[in-house]
Amino acid sequence: MRKIFYTFSLLILLPILSFAATYYVDDSGSNGDGSLSNPFNNFSDALNAAQPGDVIMVLPGTYSQDINTERSGQPGQRIVIQAYDPANRPLISTGGGALSIDHSYITVDGLIFDGEFDGSDVVKISSGGDNTILRNCEIRNGTKDGIDMNEADDVLIENCEIHHMLGGSLSNQVDAHGIVATGEQNLTIRGCNIYYTSGDCFQTDPNRDYPLWDNVLIENCTLWTGPLPADAADWNAGEIPGENAIDTKINEDAVGTSYRAKITLRHVTAYGFVPGYINNRAAFNIKEKVDCLMEGVVAYGNEIGFRLRGPGGRGGAYITMINCISYDNDIMFRVEDDLEVLKIYNSTFDLGSGNEYFDNVSGGYDPNGLDVRNSLFTGEKPDEASHSSNLLANSSFFIDMSGHNYHLSLSSPAINAGVDIPEVTDDFDGNPRNSGSYDVGAYEGGTITGIGDELAGDEVANDFYLYPNYPNPFNPGTRIAFRINRAETVQLSIYNLLGQAVRTLVSGQLAEGLHNYTWDGRNDFGNPVSSGIYIYRLEAGSFTQTRKMHLIR
């Protein structure tokens, strides 16, 4: 009976298993049957052949044809289009849209899309493209948007580099965004590096249309601009494009309803939005009827770090900031139009080369909705930070204030000087905030040390300790520190998420003490590795400790 059951089960599974196939596409030669030895020479045939669960492997080369999806995958059976060799990614270079996704459960992994500065969006994800995953791709050289999304839900954009979206010119402002989304639900943008855009790195919703967008998560991303290294489109070398890192908009008809769009920014770094090109250039332009949570956000070197805007014809934003760091902005906060809710908890602000912390315009903020606690301010403490848990800080508070390492020194007056805040459960690095002993600022004390610092707490008791790398996320390099309390044979290695060894930083006998090494984002052969999450592991005798770090290109 059991044998009959197994046979029956196998017969049921065989039709499902038989659907799984791999097809290959090459950029030259005659058209084949899609096998590795005789690949297709065009995407259309491969996409027509591919069924849910199938994989299309794109061989290295330059393709002058675009990719347009033909059918949807299914939950658990995605249609995957990916680079055959991630170290030699295929280039899709077309005069126009290079990728169009109109179907659901599609994954695109490891391709380069070049729009050749044609007048089209480089990548389009349309209303049929729910549950799209776009991963490990480079999207470049457009005069419109890098990724244009329209009513596609549950989309993941991960570990992508998006750059040189340049519409108009310095004297003729035309928006070209890195990613623009309209009517989306449950969008996640993770581990992306977006730069050199004439519009915003990310904007939602430019059309202020229906359906209303909601639930956007942007995490572990770097959004920036700076002088162009070379002429591009109608822009000249040295000119600085870009409006904002992030800009939010909604449909004005939502103002009288209970709707309030949710956007979460977690470990997002934004810099380079200096004066020029537009008035009030800000890294974060958060406005209209949104609820924005910023956790571990870093803003530096901007005209305005945070432009936060209250009720107008389209409503006003609610803002909560936790474990944020901001420095060297001309204006840290420009607060407008009686902003109703602004909560700032456990953050570190260094005025540095900036001029002022708060520029309150057209009513500024509603005092009843302002709550600033457990935060550090250098240079001066603004009136908005009157709560006793906010401290005026100087270089003695930090490991290396001049180097913008705002981890607390072991003798920092910020240690145990805070108040408990239920909304704050850990620090910038993910270390827990313990009730009754909150530190002030973005970091809990004792989580990382500099050379010459002594250790505290559990780190003293342990013979070995591997510290969180700094900075994290990082580009191009990061420091990894560890302490050993006796001479020992040590290996410090870096691995990708597949468990493959990428780089060995240390292998040999070391004396006791604190040791510091820098990883430059290269493998053992000296080649740059791609953006993504990496594991670093310390082995010393029988001791092993691992941590994660995030490289952003």
Residue ranges and their predicted role:
Residues 27-64, 429, 434, 439:
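Acidic Gly/Asp/Thr-rich repetitive segments characteristic of extracellular carbohydrate-active
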Residues 76, 93-99, 117-126, 141-149, ...:
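Extracellular beta-strand/beta-solenoid scaffold signature
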Residues 452-470, 474-496, 504-507, 516-519, ...:
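Glycine-centered coil/turn sites that cap beta-strands in beta-rich domains
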Residues 512, 527-553:
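C-terminal tail/sorting-segment detector
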Residues 412-452:
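Surface beta-loop-beta hairpin patches that serve as ligand-binding interfaces in beta-rich domains
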Residues 65-66, 89, 95, 111-118, ...:
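Surface-exposed loop/turn segments connecting beta-strands in extracellular beta-rich domains
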Residues 68-70, 75-76, 267-272, 280, ...:
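Predominantly extracellular beta-rich ligand-binding scaffolds that present long acidic/polar faces
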Residues 57-60, 72-122, 133, 166, ...:
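Right-handed parallel beta-helix/beta-spiral solenoid domain characteristic of secreted/periplasmic
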